[in-house]
């Protein structure tokens, strides 16, 4: 009887162990697709707007999105430099930039791989790389934000104006456009004279918006999404488009596939989604009121976005300014490190 009991216990223990191993194996195999089905995104766009779009992609696709955001103070430039540093051993799959020229520079340096999906096809030629290494979508405009309690009568008088430090983000794009269209010497003179006359530099477009909204400055240079944030909070502000020789500065988001991306298949899925009419319409209807670049149902666009589309009809051709950006940034770095 004792031997029979011991044998039964041995069989029971072995059975439980086997069942446990089977359960562990089942859970592991069940999780493997989820572990494989992920995508790593470096995102310079504001998290408050990007998060909703990325979570919607997760729900639709079942792909887990792992995001690394940048800070307001080093917007876009920090991630561009990180991607350059990781070029030989990439950790990122998709770069969602909040401007065009930094992405185009990465393409020239061999960091990006081509992707000709349905999203690339629907975006007009002026907003995408001919070799499909990057594509623009959902644009913003550079604008003057004006405090209407004490409205500036002369926006060229910058003694009560504000601007973000031009080393990064859309302010760097703004400076690059001036570098190309005015020439380096005129821009350098304007930069030095504006600072001498009292133009206040701060650490980001959001801070420009804040100090104008509370009346610490009468007007400033910012982007349309920051203007709408101030307006929606009840600030007494108005805006006018920044124009250079009659052309506005329209700055799209851009998306690109990283060369050697660890999760290439899901990266291509995400890029196609970001470049879809659905994603552009979602960003147009969001609080940022971004301008769709591809075809969408015009009747669904908010009135404010339709007005922005009119302002952007004639805009500076930024795509050809990559060399200017490199030169302008080199000068700016020398200015701010002396």
Language-model regions, residue ranges each:
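N-terminal Sec-pathway targeting helices
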Residues: 4-25
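Early extracytoplasmic/lumenal segment of secretory-pathway proteins
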Residues: 17-20, 30-102, 338
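Extracytoplasmic ligand-binding site segments that recognize negatively charged/polar headgroups
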Residues: 44-51, 70-77, 90-216
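A ligand-binding cleft/hinge motif common to bilobed small-molecule-binding domains
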Residues: 101-105, 213, 218-238
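Periplasmic-binding protein-like
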Residues: 122-125, 139-140, 191-195, 201-202, ...
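Mature extracytoplasmic/periplasmic domains
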Residues: 258-315
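Extracellular/periplasmic bilobal clamshell ligand-binding domains
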Residues: 298-338
């Amino acid at each position: 009887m004792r031997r029979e009991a011991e044998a039964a216990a041995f069989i029971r223990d072995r059975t439980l162990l086997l069942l446990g191993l089977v359960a562990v194996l089942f859970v592991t195999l069940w999780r493997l697709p989820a572990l494989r089905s992920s995508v790593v995104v470096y995102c310079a766009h504001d998290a408050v707007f990007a998060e909703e779009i990325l979570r919607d992609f997760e729900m639709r696709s079942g792909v887990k999105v792992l995001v690394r955001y940048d800070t307001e103070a080093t917007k876009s430039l920090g991630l561009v430099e990180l991607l350059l540093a990781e070029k030989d051993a990439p950790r990122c799959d998709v770069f969602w930039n909040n401007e065009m020229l930094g992405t185009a520079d990465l393409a020239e340096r061999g960091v990006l791989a081509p992707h000709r999906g349905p999203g690339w096809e629907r975006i007009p030629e002026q907003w995408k790389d001919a070799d499909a290494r990057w594509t623009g979508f959902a644009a913003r405009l550079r604008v003057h934000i004006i405090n209407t309690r004490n409205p500036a009568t002369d926006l060229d008088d910058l003694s009560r104006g504000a601007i973000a430090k031009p080393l990064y983000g859309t302010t760097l794009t703004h400076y690059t456009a001036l570098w190309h269209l005015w020439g380096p010497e005129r821009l350098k003179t304007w930069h030095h004279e504006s600072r001498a006359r009292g133009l206040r530099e701060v650490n980001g477009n959001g801070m420009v918006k804040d100090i104008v909204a509370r009346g610490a400055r009468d007007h400033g240079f910012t982007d349309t999404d920051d203007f709408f944030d101030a307006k929606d909070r009840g600030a007494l502000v108005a805006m006018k488009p920044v124009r250079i020789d009659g052309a506005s500065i329209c700055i799209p988001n851009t998306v690109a596939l990283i060369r050697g991306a660890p999760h290439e298949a899901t990266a291509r899925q995400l890029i196609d989604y970001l470049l879809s009419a659905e994603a552009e319409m979602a960003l147009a209807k969001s609080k940022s009121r971004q301008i769709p670049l591809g075809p969408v149902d015009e009747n669904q666009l908010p009135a404010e976005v339709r007005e922005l589309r009119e302002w952007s009809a004639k805009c500076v051709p930024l795509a050809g300014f990559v060399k200017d950006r490199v030169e302008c940034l080199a000068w700016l770095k020398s200015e701010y490190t002396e």
